[in-house]
Amino acid sequence: MTLKEIEVLLQNAVGGIDRIYEHWTGCDGSVVNLPDYTVVIDLTGGYHVMHEDFTEKLAHTWHRNSRSIGIAMACCKDAVCYYDHPDGVDLGSEPPTSAQIEAMAMLTAKAEQILGLTTDD
């Protein structure tokens, strides 16, 4: 699905979304059929919409799923977060691609604009 097509779904969700949660899946980068998320971004930056009703309550974030959308990059297989590691995280054998980071940024910016959210929300 294109960002332009996703704009329509975002417009349909105006007033029903207060938060955007961004994730990495921790799966192999080819795994995009993950229904706990609203949108999954593949290794090339392509968008895969899991649910066209963006107000549907999903299971992407523990105890914070109401009135939110979950956007995930399909990446970071074998990633580990370290409390005492100098970098804080090892992004694993499949770190996010530049295309995924750009696609995440573009979708987040468009969602904030359409939904009337800010980075403080």
Label each region the model flagged.
Residues 1-120:
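Active-site-adjacent loop/helix surface patches within enzyme catalytic domains
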